[in-house]
Structure formats: C-alpha cells, structure tokens
Amino acid sequence: MKLVNSLIAAAFVFSMATAQAGVIIGGTRIIYHADTKESSLDVKNPDPYSYLIQSWVDKDENDTSKTPFIVTPPLFRLAGNEENKLRIINTGGNLPQDRESLFWMNIKTIPATGKLDNVNTLQIAIKTRIKLIYRPASLTEMPEKFASKLSWKRSDQQLTVSNPTPYYMNFSEVKVGASTVTDATYVAPMSSATFSLPANAKGNIRWKIISDF
C-alpha cells in the first residue's frame, strides 16, 4: 500500500539538513464495520528519533464539526524504532443504515526535536488523510461485487459515473482508451460524480475498483 503525504507546515531553516517525517501508516483507508466495537490503525516509527503523533476524524477538510468517532490516543509521543496502535471508536450518532458514510482519518506527524547529531534541521509537520468508511451491519457483501452496476456517460470533455449501490466505489484507475482520467477518485452511494477528461481522449471506458483488501 502506498502512503501519500501532504506537506502542511515548515519551521525555521538552520542548515541544509532536513528531518524527514518517516512514520509509516499501516493502511490507506479504514472500513469501520458497524457491528464491531472499534477499528485500529498501526503507526510505526523506523527513525532513531521521536515524533509527536496527533490524530482526529473529520467529515471534510473544511468541515471541523464534531463527528461520531474519536481516536485514542489523540496525541502521543512515538519514540524511535517503536510502533503503536490508533483506535477509532464510534461514539454513536444517527448515521444512515442503508448505505456507507464517509469520514476522513487525519494523522499529523511532528518531529519531537529540531536536532540530529547536534546539527540544526528544518522541522516539517506532515499530515496524512485517509478515508474512514462506516459500513452498516446490513451491508454484508464486498463493494467490488457490485462494480458492474456502475454506469458511465461521456459529454464533451466530461465523464459522469452513476452509482446505484449502497457502497462507496473507490477507483484505482479509470481510462478512456489510452488516456487516464487522473481526477477520478470515488463515487458516493446512490449518487453520481463527474470528472474532467484528458484532451483528445477516445475509446472505451475501463475502470478498476479498490477492494477491501
């Protein structure tokens, strides 16, 4: 599984040496099954120095309202060459029971020190966002089983996909002929999504769904 990090903050530059965030997140998304008490996510620090790990769940990057999930521990120090487990707990709430719901798990890693071997360094905080999908107990099948139910429509330089299923369909790849539709990420349950087509894209539409495993 690949880890995609987004750079969110940088401190003072003292030399060319840089402390790179090396914390490994043990997953690219989380499926939270409604009939379980909690889900978990491993974090590992392969570096010899420590990081502060801050974690939380939100609905959207621009929506900081309270969600029905808490992460424990929310803030802790992860020593060098150690690992820990983040636990995600559903605190209750009126979530839909006929379809999946999408939240985002945020993990911010902050170097706990600005020095390595007495060399001043640039401290960088890294935030990783991965999908947290709440799956009601009534949904017992795998999403990929219903991938054939997706319907696609092309209009000018746009491609629209309709999803009549109760599952989030996450795309690993969408292609029109030999052209890759780079902004095709996912489509929500009982909904549709529209993506921009590459210039001169021609041919059949092909797609791949990311499975739970």
Short names for language-model regions:
Residues V43-D47, L159-T165:
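Asparagine-centered strand-capping/turn motif at beta-strand->loop junctions
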Residues M1-I8:
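Bacterial N-terminal signal peptides that target proteins for export
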Residues G93-K145, K202-F213:
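Terminal connector regions
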Residues M16-T18:
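N-terminal signal peptide c-region/cleavage motif recognized by signal peptidases
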Residues K66-L95, A178-N204:
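Intrinsically disordered, low-complexity Pro/Gly/Ser/Thr-rich segments with frequent PxxP/GP/PP motifs
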Residues A21-D42, M142-S151, A184-Y186:
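Beta-sheet-dominated interaction scaffolds and their linkers
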Residues I24, D42-I88:
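Surface-exposed binding patches on compact interaction domains or structured appendages
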